[in-house]
């Protein structure tokens, strides 16, 4: 039988396709060998398991930031006497010119801006206008605190709160340096009237030194409100919360409660409930 051109083309096509398939199969076998060889060489360069055990373990975070060891019992007593005996006579002489409660604040060249957020808070106190002209209340005039509400602000930076920035912030919140060498928030932003709450250094002995404020730093501060205390404790507590929040937001701090747990909205509401319960007990005792 004579083979035509068409049959020859079919045979040649089959041979070409078979050759292509064979070449592809050969290349695939050779590629697998090379890939395995490369993987083996790469794996051989890895260090032994015995020498790299730490690479397989979870990352370890070393806590180098320790919270200051100050609890509620270490806070200055609101009924404690003024500690003037420990100061040198020259330092007391400097403070005598500016008064006991506000020494050297005029010499700090700080532009204190009484912002609207805090001036509006003053409207919570019915006797605010009278308090501006009233004499400043001494913390010694207050009865001993039966209960203390504490809000601590802990600095997230390892260097802590710097003195000048800290002073500027709390002055804007209406706190004034005063008795017991700590800061107090009075009924008036000017520093007159009754004491609403106070702020102490979280590092023992809990005091501040305005003469060395430029070199001062602290890892944390504590705001505290004593009961019995201000005539309107719930409003005073709200002002204290606002001051603590302002400090934490502007100076990179973290709010903590008296148990050194993160201050939450539930904790703040629990504090308010403690105030309500204290006022209820006080009314019951008067009857």
Curated annotation (Swiss-Prot):
UniProt-listed GO biological process terms: division septum assembly; FtsZ-dependent cytokinesis
Transmembrane segments: 2-22
Localization: Cell inner membrane
Periplasmic topological segments: 1
Record keywords, A-Z: Cell cycle, Cell division, Cell inner membrane, Cell membrane, Membrane, Transmembrane, Transmembrane helix
Region annotation Disordered: where it falls in the sequence: 70-143
Membrane topology: Single-pass type I membrane protein
Side of membrane Cytoplasmic, spans: 23-287
Primary subcellular site in the record, as a coarse category: membrane
Gene Ontology CC, one term: plasma membrane
Subunit details: Interacts with FtsZ via their C-terminal domains.
PANTHER family assigned: CELL DIVISION PROTEIN ZIPA
Similarity comment: Belongs to the ZipA family.
Function summary: Essential cell division protein that stabilizes the FtsZ protofilaments by cross-linking them and that serves as a cytoplasmic membrane anchor for the Z ring. Also required for the recruitment to the septal ring of downstream cell division proteins.
HAMAP family from the UniProt entry: ZipA
Name of the protein described by the UniProt record: Cell division protein ZipA
Origin species: Pseudomonas fluorescens (strain SBW25)
